[in-house]
């Protein structure tokens, strides 16, 4: 592991609106449904592809300021690279972006009948130690965990300070009735997945997602685990490159299809990208949250950026994956803050460094600058 650095890794995978009156967007050398092959190819003329070179330079200049500390950028349009710089091919911990990655696996394996998301924890034989679950807590269903509404507020060994501060009292809400961003839910989803499929998360992700969509870097052992005394359910982490996350975002942008093949069920992507209720924390509206994705709801999603249909995966420390269907746009933002020694305590400390609201504000402005660089207004 390299020496600790606090830098931001930004990868932007963009696919500009594919049709106008049924015609491909001007300047694209690939078809509207083009996908990268074994490696990414470059667009040769930015202006013909619908981009302002000057506005992209403005976005890059902001990304390189001390306030955001971007270390790499990758911009992809129509399956080709618009621009790139930095360590977009370096594997780093994705933090809570992991949740949207495992959601895709749940979509695949539930459609094949290996996982029933309507089963309860009791039916699945799920408990915890040293503090066991109550009878009521065991009535939470898998789908309640996927929606962060389990009603189980058990201690966990890895969480941010805000998670611990906002945790409700045990027994205060029944299963399925109250949203709380809960690492216990997310960790137990890892336990259930491996129990029901007989597969390690990394192996399943590699075989069913990474290989089919041509991820260049991900391997099965890029998923690692942390345990601790508070719970028997470990935290699973994904080490993944920005360019591989760009492919994952492109997969979701195309409703789970890759080059004509359905990888993640379309119905699952639909459930993951649409909300029907506003969630909030400490009186602040946050938009929607379904199947481990953050979703625009009621015009609420992210600072300076809220478009109908936008949804995102987010991790502590400014790890972001945005999917923006109305613009055929995918945005990935990474933070290269891997510690020299990987343990739960160190990673938890990194998760609590800086201000989450400040990180979001900085990246929200950067995302707006990038979107404004498109010559389509």
Residue ranges and their predicted role:
Residues 38, 42-44, 57-64, 98, ...:
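Active-site-proximal loop and beta-strand segments within enzyme catalytic domains
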Residues 111-148, 197-235:
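Active-site helix/loop module of the DD-peptidase/beta-lactamase fold
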Residues 217, 222, 274-330:
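Active-site Gly/Thr loop motif
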Residues 79, 93-118, 145, 189-193, ...:
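Active-site SXXK
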Residues 55-88, 321, 328-332:
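A short, well-structured edge-of-sheet supersecondary motif
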Residues 7-17:
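Bacterial N-terminal signal peptides
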Residues 23, 310-377:
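Structured C-terminal helix/loop/strand segments within mature extracytoplasmic catalytic/sensor domains
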Residues 100, 188-192, 236-257, 319-335:
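Active-site-proximal alpha-helical segments within enzyme catalytic domains
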């Amino acid at each position: 592991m390299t020496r600790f650095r606090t830098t931001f890794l930004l990868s932007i995978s963009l696919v500009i609106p594919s049709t106008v009156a049924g015609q491909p967007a001007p300047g694209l050398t690939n078809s509207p449904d083009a996908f990268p092959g074994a490696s990414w190819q470059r667009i040769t003329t930015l202006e013909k592809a619908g981009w302002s070179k000057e506005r992209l330079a403005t976005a890059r200049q902001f990304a390189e300021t001390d306030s955001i500390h971007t270390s790499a950028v990758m911009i992809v349009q129509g399956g080709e690279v618009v621009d790139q710089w930095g360590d977009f091919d370096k594997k780093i911990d994705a933090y809570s972006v992991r949740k949207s990655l495992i959601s895709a696996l749940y979509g695949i394996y539930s459609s094949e009948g290996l996982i029933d998301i309507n089963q309860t924890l009791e039916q699945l034989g799920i408990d915890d130690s040293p503090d066991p679950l109550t009878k009521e807590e065991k009535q939470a269903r898998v789908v309640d965990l996927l929606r962060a509404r389990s009603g189980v507020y058990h201690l966990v060994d890895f969480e941010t300070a805000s998670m611990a501060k906002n945790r409700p009292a045990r027994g205060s809400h029944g299963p399925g009735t109250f949203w709380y961003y809960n690492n216990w839910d997310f960790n137990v989803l890892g336990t259930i997945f491996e129990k029901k499929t007989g597969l390690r998360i990394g192996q399943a992700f590699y075989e069913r997602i990474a290989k089919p969509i041509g991820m260049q870097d991900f391997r099965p052992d890029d998923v690692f685990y942390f345990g601790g005394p508070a719970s028997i359910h470990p935290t699973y982490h994904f080490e993944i490159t920005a360019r591989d996350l760009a492919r994952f975002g492109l997969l979701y942008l195309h409703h789970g299809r890759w080059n004509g093949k359905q990888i993640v069920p379309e119905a699952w992507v639909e459930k993951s990208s649409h909300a029907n209720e506003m969630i909030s924390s400490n009186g602040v509206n946050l938009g929607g949250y379904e199947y481990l994705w953050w979703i625009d709801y009621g015009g609420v999603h992210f600072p300076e950026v809220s478009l109908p249909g936008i949804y995102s995966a987010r991790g502590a420390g400014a790890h972001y994956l945005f999917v923006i269907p109305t613009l055929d746009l995918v945005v990935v933002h990474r933070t290269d803050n891997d510690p020299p020694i990987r343990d739960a305590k160190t990673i938890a400390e990194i998760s609590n460094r800086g201000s989450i609201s400040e990180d979001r504000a900085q990246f929200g402005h950067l995302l707006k600058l990038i979107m404004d660089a498109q010559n389509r207004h």
